[in-house]
């Protein structure tokens, strides 16, 4: 009997081509991770001061091993980090940071007295059930309290904080502060450099004067009222000013331009009115400008597009009018740009594309909005080139998806046709 060489050969060739055309799945290599070197305690010839060692024990800080080299293994459990100096004959504690404090922790005056005067930094993070001690050491240069001391309704008092006259860094956030005014706290802090009192129910007016050493001020999310004092512009070293989420009113002072070291200016969610002062153009390295959620009016000044270091610009939800004076290249260079919620503001369609989704209407030939834009800025109206690219890529994937399905069906049908032809030829040959 003569074998069916031709049909069989055709079938084998076709099946071989089909298999080779199918996508191959190579085994995924197992991920490799470089081993993390174990923490090596720093060697020191001096033991820790016995009185301070006893003080750490009373604060529930482990002392079986050297507490100065102890580091917590997880972030979810109660932990403490102690830093010591290298003095002799005994080392001394310089810094303690408590995180997720246990409910049985108590900060005694006796322990703090033993740790003073070497203790210069004290931090409490997420210690809501903790009660503040009657007094903190005068030696402190840095004090931090975040989401802590919430057992009392009043949290921390202004007098309690005002005693820390040697502070250079004060951070109080999500902790109520009861005081008749910010000046009570800052009056004698002549060395203060960084000041944060945010989300603290702080009320009253902004002080008319600040200490000249300040480089960072964050008084956001409080109940501060009144106007921005012109004297704040005497802070020539100030790099960041955040007064957002208060009830501050009045104009932005023209002298704001005297803050020549400023990089971040956040005045959002207040009751500020008037135009954007031209003096802001005198701040050479401003990178973050947020004036959203106010009652600012007038036209948006052209000088903003000349600020070469600007990366974040939010002017949303104000009362600006006229034609937006920015071109596409300026907007593309910004990481964040929000302009919606200005019903009388519009853009020139010959300069900017509608695809940019700015949240404002297109201008007519008279420079007026063609249609009413959204009343409030929507988070989806941010101009983001990255999102636009992602969308186009998804469209490409959706476009190419059906082609792969059609190709698979065609290969399957052709295989079936060859099989039928082979069976017919085989039947004829056998017959």
Swiss-Prot record:
One of its GO terms (biological process) is response to bacterium. Residues 26-40 have a biased composition (Pro residues). Disruption phenotype: In snc2-5 and snc2-8 mutants, impaired basal resistance to P.syringae pv. tomato DC3000 leading to increased susceptibility. It is found in: Cell membrane. Its main location: membrane. LRR repeats lie at residues 161-185, 189-211, 212-235, 236-259, 261-283, 284-307, 309-332. Changing residue 412 to R: In snc2-1D; constitutive activation of defense responses leading to enhanced resistance against H.arabidopsidis NOCO2. GO terms for cellular component: cytosol; plasma membrane. Residues 23-50, 367-399 are annotated as: Disordered. Glycans are attached at residues 100, 166, 201, 213, 242, 264, 297, 327, 348. Residues 426-431 are cytoplasmic. Involved in plant defense. Required for basal resistance against P.syringae pv. tomato DC3000. Belongs to the RLP family. This is Receptor-like protein 51.
């Amino acid at each position: 009997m003569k074998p069916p060489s031709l049909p069989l050969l055709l079938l084998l060739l076709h099946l071989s081509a089909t298999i080779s055309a199918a996508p191959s799945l190579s085994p995924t290599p197992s991920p490799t991770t470089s081993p993390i070197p174990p923490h090596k305690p720093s060697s020191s010839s001096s033991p820790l001061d016995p009185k301070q060692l006893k003080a750490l024990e009373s604060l529930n800080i482990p002392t079986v091993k050297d507490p100065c080299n102890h580091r917590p293994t997880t972030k979810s459990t109660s932990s403490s980090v102690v830093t010591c100096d290298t003095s002799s004959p005994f080392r001394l504690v310089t810094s303690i940071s408590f995180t997720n404090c246990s409910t049985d922790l108590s900060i005694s005056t006796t322990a703090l007295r033993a740790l003073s005067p070497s203790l210069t930094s004290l931090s409490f993070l997420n210690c809501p059930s903790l009660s503040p001690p009657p007094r903190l050491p005068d030696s402190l240069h840095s004090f931090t309290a975040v989401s802590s001391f919430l057992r009392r309704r009043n949290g921390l008092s202004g007098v309690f904080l005002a005693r820390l006259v040697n502070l250079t860094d004060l951070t109080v956030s999500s902790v109520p502060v009861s005081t008749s005014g910010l000046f009570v706290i800052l009056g004698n802090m002549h060395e203060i450099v960084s000041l944060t009192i945010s989300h603290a129910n702080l009320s009253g007016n902004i002080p008319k004067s600040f200490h000249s050493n300040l480089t960072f001020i964050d008084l956001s999310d409080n109940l501060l009222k009144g106007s921005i004092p012109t004297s704040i512009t005497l802070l020539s070293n100030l790099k960041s000013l955040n007064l957002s989420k208060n009830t501050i009113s009045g104009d932005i002072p023209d002298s704001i331009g005297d803050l020549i070291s400023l990089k971040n200016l956040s005045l959002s969610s207040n009751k500020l009115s008037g135009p954007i002062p031209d003096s802001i153009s005198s701040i050479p390295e401003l990178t973050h400008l947020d004036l959203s959620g106010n009652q600012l009016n007038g036209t948006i000044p052209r000088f903003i597009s000349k600020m070469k270091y600007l990366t974040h610009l939010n002017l949303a939800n104000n009362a600006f009018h006229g034609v937006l004076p920015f071109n596409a290249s300026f907007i593309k260079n910004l990481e964040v740009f929000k302009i919606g919620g200005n019903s009388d503001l519009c853009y020139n369609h010959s300069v900017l594309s509608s695809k940019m989704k700015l949240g404002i209407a297109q201008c007519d030939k008279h420079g007026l909005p063609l249609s009413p834009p959204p009343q409030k800025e929507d988070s989806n109206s941010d101009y983001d080139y990255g999102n636009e690219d992602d969308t186009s890529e998804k469209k490409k994937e959706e476009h190419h998806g059906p082609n792969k399905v059609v190709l698979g069906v065609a290969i399957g049908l052709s295989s079936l046709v060859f099989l039928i032809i082979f069976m017919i030829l085989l039947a004829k040959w056998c017959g």
